Amino acid sequence: MNTTNKESTAELNNTESNNNYNNFAENGNIINLKQLKRKLPEELQAQAEELKIENINSLLKQELVFAILKKSVEQGVLIVGEGVLEVLPDGFGFLRSPEVNYLAGPDDIYISPSQIRRFGLRTGDTVEGQIRAPKAGERYFALLKVNRVNFEDPSKAYHRVHFDNLTPLYPDEKLGLELENNSKDSKDFSTRVIELVAPMGKGQRALIVAPPRTGKTVLLQNIAHAITTNNPEVFLIVLLIDERPEEVTDMQRSVRGEVVSSTFDEPASRHVQLAEMVIKKAKRLVEHKKDVVILVDAITRLARAYNTVVPSSGKVLTGGVDANALQRPKRFFGAARNIENGGSLTIIGTALIETGSRMDEVIFEEFKGTGNSEIVLDRKIADKRIYPAIDITRSGTRKEDLLVDKIILNKMWVLRRIIDPMGSSEAIEFLLKKLENTKTNGEFFEMMKSPERPKNGL
């Protein structure tokens, strides 16, 4: 009887909230929490002054958002919120915001255990719905009605297949990275070189092997720009671990996608928590048959963070790496896969080498065989100020025949045979000169004769 009463009450509440939502929408009295969080602190302060909120100069951005929401609700405004769910051990959860890098804050949205069970929600689900102000004795805004889960109808979330039960396949759909050079002044050929040397597919697990100051961050920015331009259906996440704050700002302003970061002045536990939230969010989206790309800078620093956080096993490898420390970062990187019957998770991460740290070398060696694509950057090329500083002969993709047409693949192999006797610097200089004379790789290949398929592969 009690369960029936609760269900009928819930249905009544949903009907009422729908009617309220429609009424508010007609009057335009709706605040979108996500859009509010994207505002600059100056804009929030101006809005708070209009609402006559006191002591705004002493409030942090999250506290300012909370104060604006509370005041708006008092004035009869409806609030629609969105966030990524983090389920706590007690059974309830909170919607964390990517705008604040999934940090816990006063503007988080509470979700009850009954709502989590009803819709089959898990950590990482992107939930959108109508929220209400905290009642007496409550500290957080609460979710009143679920409108969408992972950008789809909530009913679909309950019947999805768990990520670990999905069947992984080799990448067989190309991820378009080539950007046409429309002007002679354009000097960025990085994505065109990657297309020729190490083509990427949806579900790729790629490592960018990079010594310091070889242009890895700029290369990641170019890849991100190419993905958003050529593959609008892809959900892009850029994950910056242990980075400098100014590089985070630069990435946020240059990339049209979700950029989340944990800077070098934050503890290792924070790096780990952010990485776990990002990978769980990506898995939930893949369960809904979506294509997700995560760009990680850097896998090495993430592994260092896990090494600090993991309980000591008593077995220490060379360089001070705990024997169990690399299991979880490997699980993170290993989540990249192409899924049978739809969906894919692509991870492109940078691995640092030649840093002078023995630990970094050990981490790289552990990750070396786990990827199915490698882009190797060369310090000698970068010292000559030749970018992208890609070592062509050492870079490549496994099973590239699944991604590239046979005729194009044969021409790529011939190109490698021509370049092989050259040194790394001469090879990239030779290729860049040829690319400067053409707008696209298609034009570049038309300049080459159609060869027969090589008998011995590469």
Curated annotation (Swiss-Prot):
Gene3D superfamilies: Nucleic acid-binding proteins, P-loop containing nucleotide triphosphate hydrolases. Facilitates transcription termination by a mechanism that involves Rho binding to the nascent RNA, activation of Rho's RNA-dependent ATPase activity, and release of the mRNA from the DNA template. Keywords: ATP-binding, Helicase, Hydrolase, Nucleotide-binding, RNA-binding, Transcription, Transcription regulation, Transcription termination. PANTHER family: TRANSCRIPTION TERMINATION FACTOR RHO. InterPro entries: AAA+_ATPase, ATPase_F1/V1/A1_a/bsu_nucl-bd, CSD, NA-bd_OB-fold, P-loop_NTPase, Rho-like_N, Rho_factor_ATP-bd, Rho_N_sf. SMART domains: AAA (SM00382), CSP (SM00357), Rho_N (SM00959). Residues 10-23 have a biased composition (Low complexity). Belongs to the Rho family. GO terms for molecular function: ATP binding; ATP hydrolysis activity; ATP-dependent activity, acting on RNA; helicase activity; RNA binding. Homohexamer. The homohexamer assembles into an open ring structure. Pfam families: ATP-synt_ab, Rho_N, Rho_RNA_bind. This is Transcription termination factor Rho. Residues 78-153 form the Rho RNA-BD domain. GO terms for cellular component: cytosol.
